[in-house]
Amino acid sequence: MTFVVKPQPPSKTTQSGQEAGAAALLWIRSMVEPLYDFRRPREVSTFLQAHPFLLPLLVEAHEKIAEYFEPSTKPILEVITDPESEDGRELFVLVPTHDTPEEALSRLERLDQEWWLDVLPQALGKMTIDVEYC
């Protein structure tokens, strides 16, 4: 029997700043990097370390995206400046697709209605899921 030990999500409330940063970095490297491609990896990692509450949500999002889009698709994480965001920066989860715009938007709409809108408050305005046409 093989046991796999998964790191616990980082918690700023129970750890010092340095411990929380190290825990977030471990979580990013072991749980998030294998699931996503990072555009400007340093910027994405820094953003995730500053917003560790997104890390478990990203793991769950990957599973849900695979249910609605091609399972072999590797979503992309990119930090984008959004003038409507409180600090102007937001993490975008971009789902690459070769679908027609109608089909891709239909899939995204189903993902939104059946999962994303229910968990959206957990993202605290720091994460958006969208499609990217290939």
Regions found by a protein language model. Name each.
Residues M1-L35:
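Terminal low-complexity, intrinsically disordered regions
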Residues M1-V5, S85-D87, E102-C134:
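Acidic, proline/glycine-rich low-complexity IDRs
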Residues P7-Q8, S45-K74:
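Long, contiguous juxta-domain segments that are non-catalytic but functionally important
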Residues A24-P56:
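N-terminal presequence-like segments and adjacent domain-start helices
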Residues E33, E67-L91:
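Short edge beta-strands and adjacent turn/loop segments
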Residues F38-F47, P83-D99:
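Short glycine-rich, basic-tinged beta-strand/loop micro-motifs
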Residues I80, P96-T100, E132-C134:
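Short strand-loop junctions, especially beta-strand C-caps/beta-turns
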